[in-house]
Amino acid sequence: MVNLGSIWQNLLASQAPLQSMTGNATTMAGLATYSLPQLPYAYNALEPYISAQIMELHHSKHHQTYVTNLNNALKVHVAAIASSDIPAQIAQQPAIKFNGGGHINHSLFWKNLAPAETPETNYSKAAPSLAAEIEKTWGSFDEFKKAFSAALLGIQGSGWGWLVKESTAEKGRLRIITTKDQDPVVGGEVPVFGVDMWEHAYYLQYLNGKAAYVENIWKVINWKTAEERFQGSREDAFADLKALL
């Protein structure tokens, strides 16, 4: 099987079916399925910065489509494993990668947003440890915001921008990265928070005004969640996904 990286191996492993052996045949049953997470706020809670219309379409339509397509692809993939059909297994991997990434990214994204002017969106009070590390790395929050915003606006086509924490060689070090399409954060990095730069995240409200969307997204970043992810492990950051099975 093609190596899709640890996140995809974990995704497939989490779907490991019950197996019963009859001679040389493997029977697979009990396939788990993923479900759409509930938002921790109402669709209109992020207004005026993200409209209720965008939030409802983004969550109930776009994210739901990723979940549906992921479950369908995993079902076909498991059947291909059961029949030892390697070409069919390989054929499903792009769909698993794309839709699995869409489910992972959006599940993280919803949790790192919160209504403006709430305790969760107060940068210095909600995220003291993260704020100290940001200012150590970039010199000030303003310089960090400038660098992160530039990375978001530099994405060509569709993708995501992420603040990540290294959890390997340089444990605790912060970096800004971008991922293309629905590729998630892979390897040993912890996603502290992410921003969706697909057009469906902003176009109905901002049209082609990506810069205005990027400026306003800062008003609804959930720094409490970001602080928890910064202080936690990669497993902690992805724990919510396991609960969606």
Curated annotation (Swiss-Prot):
It comes from the Eukaryota. Pfam families: Sod_Fe_C, Sod_Fe_N. It catalyses: 2 superoxide + 2 H(+) = H2O2 + O2. One of its GO terms (molecular function) is manganese ion binding. The keyword Repressor does not apply. InterPro entries: Fe/Mn_Superoxide_Dismutase, Mn/Fe_SOD, Mn/Fe_SOD_BS, Mn/Fe_SOD_C, Mn/Fe_SOD_N, Mn/Fe_SOD_N_sf, SOD_C_sf. It is found in: Mitochondrion matrix. Its main location: mitochondrion. Mn(2+) binds at residues 58, 106, 196, 200. Residues 1-32 form a transit peptide. Its EC number is 1.15.1.1. Its cofactor is Mn(2+). Keywords: Antioxidant, Manganese, Metal-binding, Mitochondrion, Oxidoreductase, Transit peptide. Gene3D superfamilies: Fe,Mn superoxide dismutase (SOD) domain (1.10.287.990), Iron/manganese superoxide dismutase, C-terminal domain (3.55.40.20). Binds 1 Mn(2+) ion per subunit. GO terms for cellular component: mitochondrial matrix; mitochondrion. Destroys superoxide anion radicals which are normally produced within the cells and which are toxic to biological systems. Homotetramer. Belongs to the iron/manganese superoxide dismutase family. This is Superoxide dismutase [Mn], mitochondrial. It comes from Neurospora crassa (strain ATCC 24698 / 74-OR23-1A / CBS 708.71 / DSM 1257 / FGSC 987).
